[in-house]
Amino acid sequence: MKILKRIWVLAAVMLLCTSQVYAGTAKSGAGKKEAAPETQYSKDGKWIFLGDSYGTHGNPSLPELITGCLGVTNFKSYCRGGYGVAKKSGGDDQRFVSRILSAAIDRSVKNVMIIGGISNDRKHSKEELRTNMSKLARTIRAKYPNSAVYYIIPNWHANWKGGTVRIQTARLYQRRVLLRLPWYKELCAENGFIFLDKVSQALRKSANDNFFIYDGHHPNVLGRQRIASAVASYFS
């Protein structure tokens, strides 16, 4: 059943990606493209996804849409809502690294993509993030020694006009959280991760567009498709 579902998702997403070659990048002047590490990327290699609810929300999910756009069928998602780089809640370990500690070493993995985490890490200091990002990097390299590692944080900078109290609250919340975004870019650079900035900004939008569900920051299917198309554009 899982195989049939993936085949269906792949067919639907490939159709979507051919018709939508990330128009948002063109609008925002993204002709200046980040260089893709061609020696690492391979459609034949396995993909691993680590992330929070950005990687689990919706059907098809963001990992399914990304791999569909890339024509990749061999992937595994370890995403789970509420997780982050450094997050611990009481005695509960909700760090990304905890999701792969028991995973077997897999040299067939060529690409690891980390999605989100910034809102769940909001109570942790920069030094806590640094310590845990370093541990995450060491663990990924031990488990998947042939992989390149990418990090995306889907952008919440939306031009909401008016709106409900819920949306206004989400807007204030996201501004506070995204003040920490430079930390993630810096720590990715320190650990050899590739922060896909243009992909992370795929949801910048005009007031007439709507890429989010009711909570104001999780992408709806259109938003997820836009992010997936941005990833495909990066690798094209």
PLM region spans:
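N-terminal secretory targeting modules
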Residues: 1-50, 54-59, 64, 68-73, ...
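Active-site phosphate/pyrophosphate- and oxyanion-stabilizing loops and adjacent acidic/basic residues
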Residues: 64, 138, 182-185
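Generic structural signal for well-ordered alpha-helices
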Residues: 100-101, 133-137, 181
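Proline-centered loop/turn at the N-terminus of a beta-strand
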Residues: 112, 147-148, 194
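Hydrophobic, well-structured mid-protein blocks that either form specific transmembrane helices
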Residues: 125-145
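Catalytic His-Asp segment of secreted/periplasmic serine-dependent ester chemistry enzymes
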Residues: 156-236
